[in-house]
Amino acid sequence: MRRRPLLLTPHFVAAYFIAGCGGVSPSTAWQAQCPQGSYAPQSLDEWFRTSAEVTQGRHGPKVEGYIYNNYFAGAEQMLIGIEQLSPSGHAVACTTVWVIGSVPQGNRAYFVAPAPDASAKYRVRILSFNWMKRGGQ
């Protein structure tokens, strides 16, 4: 039996966020440090690029941005760490969030997380992901 493709209708997207499965869960917790990543940073730098900025949301400051996929295969189930940096550039706190959806090859995917301090600098690190099979299956 052939599976029907998942369509991202407005109702599905709303239910996704209400269920807490999106890029931000209401209980996003900041901890002292991020877990160790699954891939070498040199490989990640070849495959992906990140961009992030602190913006003001309805419920306070947030870190939002994109993961850009430069590789010839899509990535899915991507977990990222967002590190709050001290003035000297050292990580002082971290939260982990799932990137919303997949990161298609040659494209980008969005992420967002609440930020504890709008004036702080933040760094985004990819902690883990799975390569998608060719053909998107």
Residue ranges, per PLM feature:
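Intrinsically disordered, low-complexity Pro/Gly/Ser/Thr-rich segments with frequent PxxP/GP/PP motifs
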Residues: 94-118
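Bacterial N-terminal signal peptides that target proteins for export
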Residues: 1-10
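Asparagine-centered strand-capping/turn motif at beta-strand->loop junctions
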Residues: 67-71
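C-terminal motif of bacterial Sec signal peptides marking the signal peptidase cleavage site
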Residues: 18-20
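Terminal connector regions
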Residues: 116-137
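Beta-strand signatures of extracellular beta-sandwich domains
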Residues: 79-83
